[in-house]
């Protein structure tokens, strides 16, 4: 399984996803500024991975300060420093709720440590570092549970009596988008491990091509039977009875309290197609992605990306992969002067979602045809 995030003894390295799948290069992240730019520039992406890298970037910076004895001994000063850095990191990707959620949780950790009698600046920093490391470990555990829960649900509700299923996924939600294993792609991995996956299909996911560059890369790496399609081929794929897609499984950057889901642009279109073709549509996400403070999708801020992502494309020159020197080039593909609208995400209404796969189980709509996600947090749902 791919490892996109490496953290050991205060040293953080991430796999530069802008160069994948042609070049595998790990880049060091030593400061919060390094982490902020890596997230903003999409060298790392995927809601869980963004949160983990942001927290570990600050952990790496704090480790360096502790080791060089440059950290204030005042717990209040260290707490304030951490709080300001967390606020800065959250601005790198505002749509992904995991980042803000992680910042709130770790801010609470350092605040509690600061209030403890006799605490020191060193202890406050150490508490943050440990909490960030623990967060990474828990994410991996949660992902494997999500994969298992989703695979079990699909076998019961979407297989239609078949021993194997075909699944379509969108964007990248695997090891490259999380601490490891993945959310929606984790469901695909779990199906493959259980020998119940007939075939996986992935969209290229324009305009940033996370599907063709990253998901396809992971599927090939893990030797999972898979086929790449363009985004515009999805309807034809679902209509093809010979293919027989059983379910569409996607990730999420934010799930509102009513189940409305913000995810990579194109997700909404897939949900509409799934409803028309009678294909199950599932969202796979840890509970940290569910924002009970956001009532519906109308309240979610959608990030607008640069026009250049649509009007140009990056990759090596054809044939250069046969050499040791691979240079990533940018090629223009649109008419000069054309206006561009480039939202990074869209909102899929809860009414189009058949189930939300979490680490504690799969939530379905109630008798009133609405999601009641509060039970995921008070233990009443499962």
UniProtKB/Swiss-Prot annotation:
Sorted alphabetically, the Gene Ontology BP terms of this entry are: L-methionine salvage from methylthioadenosine
Subcellular location per UniProt equals:
Cytoplasm; Nucleus
Q: What class of enzyme is it?
A: isomerase
Q: Which UniProt keywords apply?
A: Amino-acid biosynthesis, Cytoplasm, Isomerase, Methionine biosynthesis, Nucleus
**One cellular component (GO) term of this entry:** cytoplasm
Active site (catalytic residues): 253
Q: Which Enzyme Commission number(s) are listed?
A: 5.3.1.23
Isomerase is among the record's keywords: yes
The pathway noted for it is:
Amino-acid biosynthesis; L-methionine biosynthesis via salvage pathway; L-methionine from S-methyl-5-thio-alpha-D-ribose 1-phosphate: step 1/6
Give GO terms: molecular function aspect only. Answer: S-methyl-5-thioribose-1-phosphate isomerase activity
The annotated site for Transition state stabilizer falls at: 171
Tell me which Pfam families the record gives: IF-2B
Has UniProt tagged this entry with the keyword Lipid metabolism? Answer: no
| UniProt catalytic activity | 5-(methylsulfanyl)-alpha-D-ribose 1-phosphate = 5-(methylsulfanyl)-D-ribulose 1-phosphate
Q: Please state which protein family the record places this protein in.
A: Belongs to the eIF-2B alpha/beta/delta subunits family. MtnA subfamily.
- Described purpose of this protein according to its UniProt entry: Catalyzes the interconversion of methylthioribose-1-phosphate (MTR-1-P) into methylthioribulose-1-phosphate (MTRu-1-P).
Protein name per UniProt: Methylthioribose-1-phosphate isomerase
């Amino acid at each position: 399984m791919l490892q996109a995030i490496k953290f050991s003894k205060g040293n953080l390295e991430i796999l530069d996803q802008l160069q994948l799948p042609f070049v595998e290069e790990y880049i060091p992240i030593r400061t919060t500024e390094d982490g902020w730019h890596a997230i903003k520039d999409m060298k790392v992406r995927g809601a869980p991975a963004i949160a983990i890298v942001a927290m570990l970037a600050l952990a790496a910076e704090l480790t360096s300060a502790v080791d060089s004895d440059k950290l204030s001994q005042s717990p209040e000063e260290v707490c304030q420093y951490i709080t300001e850095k967390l606020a800065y990191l959250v601005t790198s990707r505002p749509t992904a709720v995991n980042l803000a959620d992680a910042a709130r949780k770790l801010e609470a950790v350092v605040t509690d440590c600061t209030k403890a009698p006799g605490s020191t600046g060193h202890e406050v920093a150490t508490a943050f570092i440990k909490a960030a490391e623990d967060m990474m470990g828990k994410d991996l555990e949660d992902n494997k549970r999500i994969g298992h829960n989703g695979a079990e649900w699909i076998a019961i509700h979407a297989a239609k009596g078949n021993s194997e299923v075909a699944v379509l996924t969108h964007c990248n939600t695997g090891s490259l988008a999380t601490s490891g294993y993945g959310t929606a792609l984790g469901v695909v991995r779990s199906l493959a491990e259980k020998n119940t996956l007939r075939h996986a299909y992935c969209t290229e996911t324009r305009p940033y091509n996370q599907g063709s560059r990253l998901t396809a890369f992971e599927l090939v790496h893990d030797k999972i039977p898979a086929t790449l399609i363009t985004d515009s081929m999805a309807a034809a794929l679902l209509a093809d009875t010979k293919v027989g897609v059983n379910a569409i499984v996607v990730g999420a950057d934010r799930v509102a309290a009513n189940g409305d889901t913000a995810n990579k642009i194109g997700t909404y279109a897939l949900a509409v197609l799934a409803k028309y073709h009678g294909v199950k549509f599932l969202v796979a996400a840890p509970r940290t992605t569910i924002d009970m403070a956001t009532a519906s999708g109308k309240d979610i801020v959608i990030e607008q990306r640069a026009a250049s992502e649509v009007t140009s494309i990056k990759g090596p020159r054809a044939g250069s992969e046969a050499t040791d020197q691979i240079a990533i080039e940018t090629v223009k593909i649109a008419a000069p002067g054309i206006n561009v609208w480039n939202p990074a995400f869209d909102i899929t209404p809860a009414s189009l979602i058949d189930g939300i796969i979490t680490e504690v189980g799969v939530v379905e709509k109630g008798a009133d045809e609405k999601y009641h996600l509060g039970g995921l947090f008070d233990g009443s749902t499962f």
